[in-house]
Amino acid sequence: MDIEERINLVLKKPTEEVLTVENLRHLFEVGAPLQHYIGFEISGYIHLGTGLMAGAKIADFQKAGIKTRIFLADWHSWINDKLGGDLEVIQEVALKYFKVGMEKSIEVMGGDPKKVEFVLASEILENGDYWQTVIDISKNVTLSRVMRSITIMGRQMGESIDFAKLIYPMMQVADIFYQGVTIAHAGMDQRKAHVIAIEVAQKLKYHPIVHNGEKLKPVAVHHHLLLGLQEPPVWPITSEEQFKEIKAQMKMSKSKPYSAVFIHDSPEEIKQKLRKAFCPAREVNYNPVLDWAEHIIFREEPTEFTIHRPAKFGGDVTYTTFEELKKDFAEGKLHPLDLKNAVAEYLIELLKPIREYFERHPEPLELMRSVKITR
Ligand SMILES: Nc1ncnc2c1ncn2[C@@H]1O[C@H](COP(=O)(O)OP(=O)(O)OP(=O)(O)O)[C@@H](O)[C@H]1O
Ligand SMILES: N[C@@H](Cc1ccc(O)cc1)C(=O)O
């Protein structure tokens, strides 16, 4: 596969941003080690945003010949008060639920879970050099910048937080350097950590990634944040500014009821959540159901997506590109209920192997039911 094809795989949907494509091309050209990583807090059930969006990109990275790694951020979850802030519970959930849930998600998106390395944060934290890296980074970042970056842990600026939470962003940057990551991957909400990493890499006393004597910059790949199904806090949205702000806040999240479909949800739950979803007729700018169609169903184009309707409502219709579907919806030729039902059916089929796995192996979900999901 040539370099342009490999770059196109990295750029493929749901990628929203690559910092920068030139540096990525350079990594390929000089034959640098291609070490990817994506980190997750261990906080609750895996939803379509965390499982399928990350899983899809992991599949693409593997096809592009990049080594893939999932970083199970147990210490970070403890700092961020997840699962009652109990490190032992967090580690148990990481190894017995989260790992297998991500493996299954990667598989349904066409990747090979056996080629993904899973690393628990506490394994690398034990090494003394890790903390030296954290301090080195901290000496190159201002306090106000650290405070602005707490959004990477789902916290808001101005929120009252304990001091440990200010160490977290520096740890996330250290995780990149310490693991020799050349391709740091996450959803768009994590970009602040990666921008710090790219800048600070140039300022440290030692350089974190050296290849054949050359100091390389890490590359950041950010995927689209899948919208949650809930209604936005204000409607209609009247300005571009307001639109951007709302979109950033309205990502699918397990903490918002009816926002998320979980990877193990039953067909009935999926149908019910979609039936209640925010999906006004003709609305194509802010529409979570269309957002899911674009980033999950039409990730590959052309693809055949058939919407079944009774003859009196126009009969079956098949779309091969997202643009065709969007156009019909905008013109009122496709009813929200028909779109919702078809997206629900697609997801039920896509998630079937995961559901069946958890039916055969109920222990991970039993464990999840026994833990306290906080925040
Ligand atoms: N809706 C989403 N769409 C795509 N990626 C997501 C989404 N939500 C989270 N991610 C990504 O998954 C990774 C883990 O994020 P995080 O732990 O915040 O997810 P979460 O389970 O949705 O958390 P929370 O429900 O507390 O917001 C990050 O890279 C993040 O950008
Ligand atoms: N901040 C990430 C989790 C994370 C933690 C450490 C990392 O090195 C990377 C990612 C989130 O909230 O989803």
Curated annotation (Swiss-Prot):
Amino-acid positions noted as binding L-tyrosine in the UniProt annotation, renumbered to this chain: Y37, Y168, Q172, D175, Q190
Signal peptide feature range: none
BP-aspect Gene Ontology terms: tyrosyl-tRNA aminoacylation
Catalytic activity: tRNA(Tyr) + L-tyrosine + ATP = L-tyrosyl-tRNA(Tyr) + AMP + diphosphate + H(+)
Keywords of the record: Aminoacyl-tRNA synthetase, ATP-binding, Cytoplasm, Ligase, Nucleotide-binding, Protein biosynthesis
Binding site for ATP: K254
Cysteines joined through disulfide linkages: none
Protein name from the UniProt record: Tyrosine--tRNA ligase
Organism: Pyrococcus abyssi (strain GE5 / Orsay)
